[in-house]
Amino acid sequence: MPDDLLNSFMTGPDEKGRFGDFGGRFVSETLMPLILELEQQYEHAKTDDSFWAEMQDLWTHYVGRPSPLYFAKRLTERLGGAKIYLKRDELNHTGAHKINNVLGQIILARRMGKTRIIAETGAGQHGVATATVCAKFGLKCIVYMGATDVERQAPNVFRMKLLGAEVVPVTSGRGTLKDAMNDALRDWVTNVRDTFYCIGTVAGPHPYPAMVRDFQAIIGKETRDQMMAAEGRLPDTLIAAIGGGSNAMGLFFPFLDDKSVNIIGVEAGGHGVNEKMEHCASLTGGRPGVLHGNRTYLLQDEDGQILEGHSISAGLDYPGIGPEHAWLHEIGRAQYVSITDREALDAFQLSCETEGIIPALEPSHALAHVCKIAPDMPRDHLLVMNMCGRGDKDIFTVARALGWDMDGA
């Protein structure tokens, strides 16, 4: 990567919400006033000490932050090579990184006088986090979830309902995250007066990509401090799984200007990155286009129609990527690779067997890439992987994929 590309990689987006050629706000006239109001509210909140004091109090006493930075000793010994640390965001309240961001958005929603919260969800973790925070603050919660994901993420559907949320199965398209987001946007257009759309990833129209990144950046900030305390220096490599890319952006962002730190995002390779598009690796196998209010890399056909893609992981089953990731890819600051379903399943089992940690299928993709590269690294190479979610929600999917009979277990 050329040293003279930029003075800083942390100044974006610009006033139009763009990261280079990516991002922006491609929304209907009905939504534009709400988007501009949200941007104004967030710009004010960013410099409001009372906002961040409330966030820090909730992160500490409700979420349970800071999450540990854990040296995976047996995994390191099994693989040889790099010294592997796991950022344990699966230990957060609700079991994933999603609640870091949801708290911030719902505090903003309350400041804006909104009483009805809508959200999209794939793996269900963002839906659970949104339902959780809505229950805490007494807000109405509606979660849009693809019908396919409702079936494969049944435990999280039940959790959302227990928390008082209305779960709306989306049957259009292939019934996955893209379709859930489409229906959530349609709801928002219809109910702009009292409704706040709590987006779960670093995608969507500006200011969402930057706002979600800023709320998730607590992951990387903690990691910097914890690594300095544990090793006396910064990590050499960061690795995180990428669907829309919020957990990865949260880990990566505080390190973007540290050019000694290698950054790797891991996309869902599905059945393999090929012309059949049986994957969700939009950076590896897609091209630029516009979806859900922003310009980014997408899986699309020759006519620009969005393709469905595939991943065993509901949280990575999205045919796009956050615009800041698209920009980092194009300028060469971060590297993006893909991992197949099979490789992720193998890594899922390895984590269980070596560390006693049942990972979600999303970070299992990141772990699979760790398994590929760690053995060839020197023993003093410090590698940090974000364990962004726990695998309780995925045990039935994994059992089916491995041919295990859960009824006879």
From Swiss-Prot:
Pathway(s) the chain acts in: Amino-acid biosynthesis; L-tryptophan biosynthesis; L-tryptophan from chorismate: step 5/5
Record has Lyase as a keyword: yes
Cofactors, names only: pyridoxal 5'-phosphate
GO molecular function: tryptophan synthase activity
Any one annotated GO CC term: cytoplasm
Record's keyword terms, sorted: Amino-acid biosynthesis, Aromatic amino acid biosynthesis, Lyase, Pyridoxal phosphate, Tryptophan biosynthesis
PROSITE patterns xref list: TRP_SYNTHASE_BETA
Entries under Pfam families matching the protein: PALP (PF00291)
Enzyme Commission number(s) of this protein: 4.2.1.20
Keyword hit for Amino-acid biosynthesis: yes
Catalytic activity as recorded in UniProt: (1S,2R)-1-C-(indol-3-yl)glycerol 3-phosphate + L-serine = D-glyceraldehyde 3-phosphate + L-tryptophan + H2O
Positions carrying N6-(pyridoxal phosphate)lysine: K98
Subunit structure: Tetramer of two alpha and two beta chains.
Family (UniProt): Belongs to the TrpB family.
Summary of the function given for this chain in its UniProt record: The beta subunit is responsible for the synthesis of L-tryptophan from indole and L-serine.
PANTHER family per the UniProt record, alphabetical: TRYPTOPHAN SYNTHASE, TRYPTOPHAN SYNTHASE-RELATED
Protein name: Tryptophan synthase beta chain
Species: Jannaschia sp. (strain CCS1)
